[in-house]
């Protein structure tokens, strides 16, 4: 029987306490980051910088100088997209295959350099009943645009959660018609290449 993991619903507790504890449990080895991932709650909201140091996830409030990737989530979409994904993935499988945006923490310097050349925002538009939830990913030098991203990935919540679990790859969902790419697909492909 698997242990029930309590997932906090505030971004501060989730990022500063829960996520580092999950990394510690996962034992990701002695990997250190080539740079930081910036997590932003709302387009002009609170920010946290995340990085790996000898396998431990360090999360600090504010923007680090060496940000590689930005993840922006509207405040109202944090629980439905981030917390819900954590709840369905808790305790199952490899952490890095579950949390897409966190994968960038382990990339090497060469891939980090390639990621820095990406210009544009990839924004998931996730259909959740009557609501559309959004989470945007952009390289460090590009300001994220949730309203008019250069590339939009549209899917149902169930498919988004499958991606987060690591049980479906985005390209598999594109091929089956369950994930629709609108706009510049090249941006999504360039970002994806940095993770593999």
Predicted segments with their positions:
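Feature captures hydrophobic
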Residues: 1-196
